[in-house]
Amino acid sequence: EKHIYVSVSFMKKLNCFNTSILRAAHSESFLIFDIFFTPNACVEIDNDYGEYNASDSGGRIASYTKNNILYSTGTFRYRDLAQDPKNELGKILSIDKNTAKAKIISMGHRNVMGLTYFEKTNEIWSTEHGPNGGDEINLNDNLDSVTPTNFGWPVSSYGEHYSASSLSPEGALIVDSDDKTYNKAPLHKSHSDFGFREPELYFVPSIGISAITTIKKNFFKNFDHSIVFGSKGNNYDAEG
């Protein structure tokens, strides 16, 4: 690889932010970074959706094909953007390293934290922060399709809105189903019933899921095509 790529929160215009990529050529002395890719949209702090959170930003970069990299983008809490097929926020993108043109690989994402491509089986594995509960491990094995795979956010999630939920001393979610946030984002407890791809695994409560990678046979021969992922939080059993 001739370049170094760095993901940053970027002010595309005054008080309007997205997650973008800076790139620098390899150098043994110093690095000069320029803007390589910025999505076609940004989220204003004071927006008509009425919510903004800079931590819902995605920003994971991963190797993909010879001429492309993978990149995850968040919606900065403007949840509806994840279901807009013309908007590049709330997506996993394939970005051409020569032209910086992006193609939407999958949509319906909240906040992808881990991202890896397994070339042998042509699969993308990703991890995703849910809201209060509902952290996910997702598999996209439909990469040759013209239509992006849709993982359902914010229509479906196994978590709950922070404004409407709390954890009991035993670790169970206590939910206020009358919270008005559900009018904007219902978080149905099924993905497939609404035409979306189910997560391979999900965690309730959340575990603070983070990076993910696949194990290749030449590393551990008995674990070929296994995945390893990290967690920053609690140790709970997965479902799915």
Question: What is the role of each PLM region?
Answer:
Residues 75-240:
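Beta-propeller domain segments
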